């Protein structure tokens, strides 16, 4: 008699993906972030669904409906804090997941890597629209400034912005359509994540050594299911500590003031997870140039498979490339800090140097380091 998980059409799919899946025997904790991102997505969809039951996407009542959720709905304050901090946690896991992919050379799986970049863009779009819903000062002005960047596109820019706004400024129509998109996008992300997994299971997982592991594989269950479960427990412990003790740590206190189109905040900035890209945007004095640099700051990830010059896949035994990668991480942290500062000296020049260094490391220094390391191995 065949085991049900190997014969039932639905169970068979789950079995191939999560139970009998052959996995490298040496993958470390850095490979946990895929499952943690899945957990974050589930938290966001469930908490978002409950928030949508009480939220009204209308400029007159949006702010008071969020207040109503926090004050009158049973555990509404908890659901709202979970959703707001869940977004931050999502991006923390996402950036660590991308960092691991760069460090261990996982970008050589082209389809998996490119579907991951599409997932990143979708998640960023969802996060941006979610920021608008409380209809606080930073919601309104952040939406105005960021959407207005599209007006830099030649010829169609102004029409495009007015089409997105649904009028001549960010208003009720904008909030309504953002709510519709924000509701549907997580389900598109979930579908895209399944495509991402499909591509990954075509090739199998990479490992810290960056070498083929076909000769030494173990079943995913129970080894990596247990490992993933431990990661989830640790993640949830960190998450609920943040939600219950310091829910506004990563938020913007300006958003506790209702949106006022007549009063511009002294410093308009997006959420912390977009600050590095925002700093790159601001470092270029030209509007169109800034928008191009903003898009390229994420799209440059797609070039990694094409600018790989080293014979070794992983950075584990490549000290020069390791140094450059950690230099890039430091640079992104500096850009994140700069993005949250006002546009005045010395922040302007620091942002410009950090932006130049970001592209220089990825496009020039890392490929050169790879070629040098090839020569060093031959010695």
Swiss-Prot record:
Pfam families to which the protein is assigned, alphabetical: Cytochrom_B_C, Cytochrome_B
Keyword Metal-binding (UniProt): yes
Cofactor remark from the record: Binds 2 heme b groups non-covalently.
Segments passing through the bilayer: 33-53, 77-98, 113-133, 178-198, 226-246, 288-308, 320-340, 347-367
CC annotations in GO: mitochondrial inner membrane; respiratory chain complex III
GO molecular function, one term: metal ion binding
GO biological process, alphabetically ordered: mitochondrial electron transport, ubiquinol to cytochrome c
Keyword terms: Electron transport, Heme, Iron, Membrane, Metal-binding, Mitochondrion, Mitochondrion inner membrane, Respiratory chain, Transmembrane, Transmembrane helix, Transport, Ubiquinone
Gene3D superfamilies named in the record: Cytochrome Bc1 Complex, Chain C
SUPFAM superfamilies xref list: a domain/subunit of cytochrome bc1 complex (Ubiquinol-cytochrome c reductase), Transmembrane di-heme cytochromes
Family (UniProt): Belongs to the cytochrome b family.
Assembly behavior: The cytochrome bc1 complex contains 11 subunits: 3 respiratory subunits (MT-CYB, CYC1 and UQCRFS1), 2 core proteins (UQCRC1 and UQCRC2) and 6 low-molecular weight proteins (UQCRH/QCR6, UQCRB/QCR7, UQCRQ/QCR8, UQCR10/QCR9, UQCR11/QCR10 and a cleavage product of UQCRFS1). This cytochrome bc1 complex then forms a dimer.
Function: Component of the ubiquinol-cytochrome c reductase complex (complex III or cytochrome b-c1 complex) that is part of the mitochondrial respiratory chain. The b-c1 complex mediates electron transfer from ubiquinol to cytochrome c. Contributes to the generation of a proton gradient across the mitochondrial membrane that is then used for ATP synthesis.
Protein name: Cytochrome b
Lineage summary: Eukaryota, Metazoa, Chordata, Craniata, Vertebrata
């Amino acid at each position: 008699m065949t085991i049900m998980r190997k014969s039932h059409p639905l169970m068979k799919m789950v079995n191939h993906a999560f139970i009998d899946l052959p996995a490298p025997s040496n993958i470390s904790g850095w490979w946990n972030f895929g499952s943690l991102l899945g957990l974050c997505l589930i938290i966001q969809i469930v908490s978002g669904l409950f928030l949508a039951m009480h939220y009204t996407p209308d400029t007159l009542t949006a702010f008071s409906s969020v207040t109503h959720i926090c004050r009158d709905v049973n555990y509404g304050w908890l659901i709202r804090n979970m959703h707001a901090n869940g977004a931050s946690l999502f991006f923390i896991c996402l950036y660590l997941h991308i960092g691991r992919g760069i460090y261990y050379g996982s970008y050589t799986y082209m389809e998996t890597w490119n579907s991951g970049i599409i997932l990143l863009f979708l998640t960023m779009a969802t996060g941006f629209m979610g920021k608008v819903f409380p209809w606080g000062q930073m919601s309104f002005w952040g939406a105005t400034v960021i959407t207005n960047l599209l007006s830099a596109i030649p010829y169609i820019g102004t029409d495009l912005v007015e089409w997105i706004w649904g009028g001549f400024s960010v208003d009720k129509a904008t909030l309504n359509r953002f709510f519709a998109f924000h509701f549907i996008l997580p389900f598109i992300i979930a579908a895209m994540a399944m495509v991402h997994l499909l591509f990954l299971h075509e090739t199998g997982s990479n490992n810290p050594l960056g070498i083929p592991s076909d000769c030494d594989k173990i079943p995913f269950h129970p080894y990596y299911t247990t490992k993933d479960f431990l990661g989830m427990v640790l993640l949830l412990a960190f998450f609920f500590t943040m939600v219950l003790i310091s829910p506004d740590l990563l938020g913007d206190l300006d958003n506790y003031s209702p949106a006022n189109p007549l009063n511009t905040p002294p410093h308009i900035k997006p959420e912390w997870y977009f600050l590095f890209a925002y700093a790159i945007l601001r470092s270029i004095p030209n509007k169109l140039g800034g928008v191009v640099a903003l898009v390229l700051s994420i799209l440059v990830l797609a070039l990694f498979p094409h600018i790989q010059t080293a014979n070794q896949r992983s950075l584990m035994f490549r000290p020069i490339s390791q140094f450059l990668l950690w230099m890039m991480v430091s640079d992104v942290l500096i850009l994140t800090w700069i993005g949250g500062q006002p546009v005045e000296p010395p922040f302007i020049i620091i942002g410009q140097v950090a932006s130049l260094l970001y592209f220089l490391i990825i496009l020039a220094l890392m490929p050169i380091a790879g070629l040098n390391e090839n020569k060093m191995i031959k010695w």
